[in-house]
């Protein structure tokens, strides 16, 4: 219980943590169902907290991959991922924090693009982020 109070866990994570202590699989499922019923554990809450904490540094592809690894359903993942505008804003912030200025040549642009792709941003979002005017306060547009 102490561990659950400190941070949200997915059902799959909790299952893995409790499995060594369970007598059998049925008992473990009963406990997990009770936790969900009492709202002590919620995959939806876990997914929202996870996306909220990581979305400013990572793109949708990476978030989706990590959430799948935590055993979260595709429906919950799809509902929790940031909008295209939010993701573009995050990609611009990540690029500016890392590189401080726009690419001066093709090699620098490739390096910046690889960095954003590694962070899980789609190629379209990464290209739009690198094309954004670095001097503007809000450098994205809604058609992005």
What are these regions (language model features)?
Residues 1-144:
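An alpha-helical, amphipathic repeat domain used for nucleic-acid recognition
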């Amino acid at each position: 219980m102490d561990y659950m109070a400190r941070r949200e866990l997915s059902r799959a994570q909790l299952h893995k943590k409790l499995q060594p202590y369970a007598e059998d699989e049925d008992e473990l499922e009963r406990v997990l169902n009770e936790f969900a019923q009492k709202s002590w554990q919620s995959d939806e809450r876990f997914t929202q907290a996870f996306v909220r904490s990581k979305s400013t540094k990572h793109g949708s592809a990476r978030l989706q991959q990590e959430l799948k690894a935590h055993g979260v359903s595709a429906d919950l993942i799809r509902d929790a991922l940031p909008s295209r505008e939010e993701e573009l804003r995050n990609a611009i912030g990540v690029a500016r924090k890392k590189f401080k200025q726009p690419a001066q040549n093709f090699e620098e642009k490739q390096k910046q693009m690889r960095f954003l792709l590694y962070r899980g941003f789609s190629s379209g979002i990464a290209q739009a982020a690198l094309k954004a005017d670095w001097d503007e306060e809000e450098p994205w547009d809604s058609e992005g």
